Structure formats: C-alpha cells, structure tokens
Amino acid sequence: MGSEQNDSTSFSPSEPKLCVKGCGFFGSPSNMNLCSKCYRDIRATEEQTASAKAAVEKSLNPNKPKTQPQQSQEITQGVLGSGSSSSSTRGGDSAAAPLDPPKSTATRCLSCNKKVGVTGFKCRCGSTFCGTHRYPESHECQFDFKGVAREAIAKANPVVKADKVDRI
C-alpha cells in the first residue's frame, strides 16, 4: 500500500525527447522541446525580425520636428478636455526619444592583438594599446606630438611686436 502512494505522488521518469527540429540533440520542455542551439537560433531570428519591423515602421513614419502650429493644436485639444488624446501625445513623445548609439570600444592592443579590456591605454593617435605598447616609442606612433605642442604654445602665447619708432 505504501508503495502505491509513493508511485502516485512521485514524478514518473520520462524519456528525454529529441529536438523538434530534428537536429539529433535532446530538447527540453522549457525551450519548447528544442535543443539549446535551435532555441537560441529561433530567439535570434525573432529579435531580428522585430527590430526590422521597428526600423520599417520608423522609416515609414519619420519623426517630424515640432513647430508652433502643432503645439497650438495640442494645446487646443488639451483645452477641449480630451484627456485620452493628451495622454497619447505624451506617450508618443517618450517613444520618439532618440536612443544613444552603442559605443564601439577597442578591446585589443593594436600592436600585439592582446585583450586589454578596461585597462587599455588610449593613445593620442586614436588607438588602444596594452601596458607594454602604451608608450609612443613602443608602438611606433605616427602622431606629431611636437607639432601639436608648438601650435598649442603659439596659440596660448601670441607674439607681440612693437611698432617701429620713427627717427627724428
């Protein structure tokens, strides 16, 4: 009797199911019976299609700069008491806020191709280097340090020439 209760309350071991796409790997129910690779591929394509749709919608409906007549129309709509239209215009403004473009940071030394991560040194020539190649002499920098310094000094200290004195 006791064993019957344990059998009914415990989970029966089920055989692992193969991936639905038929790649040969085992799928899991949490991934819609797909293996991890197929699931990751499907998610990536879904994200790409969603971003493509958003880009198409954005190109079809470009954001126009606000001008005075449009602002006056929004004010008149707000005065008329249509709270739903004023809230919808606010929601549209927050969605139209420009996104910051992703920064492309160099994570490898230009000379030895070593990963530098956060500890990379940025040279005035515009490249990132590791601790060994951070000095201009070690990475054969083509940046003209002397020329830039001369220009900075000349700009900071303008030459003052006195007028010539007329002889009597």
From Swiss-Prot:
Zn(2+) 1 binds at residues 19, 23, 35, 38. A zinc finger (A20-type) spans 13-47. GO terms for molecular function: DNA binding; zinc ion binding. Residues 49-105 are annotated as: Disordered. Pfam families: zf-A20 (PF01754), zf-AN1 (PF01428). Zn(2+) 2 binds at residues 109, 112, 130, 133. Keywords: Metal-binding, Zinc, Zinc-finger. Zn(2+) 3 binds at residues 123, 125, 139, 141. It comes from the Eukaryota. Residues 60-76 have a biased composition (Polar residues). InterPro entries: AN1-like_Znf, AN1_A20_ZnFinger, Znf_A20, Znf_AN1. SMART domains: ZnF_A20, ZnF_AN1. A zinc finger (AN1-type) spans 103-149. Residues 82-94 have a biased composition (Low complexity). Signal peptide: none annotated. May be involved in environmental stress response. This is Zinc finger A20 and AN1 domain-containing stress-associated protein 1. It comes from Arabidopsis thaliana (Mouse-ear cress). The lineage of its organism: Eukaryota, Viridiplantae, Streptophyta, Embryophyta, Tracheophyta.
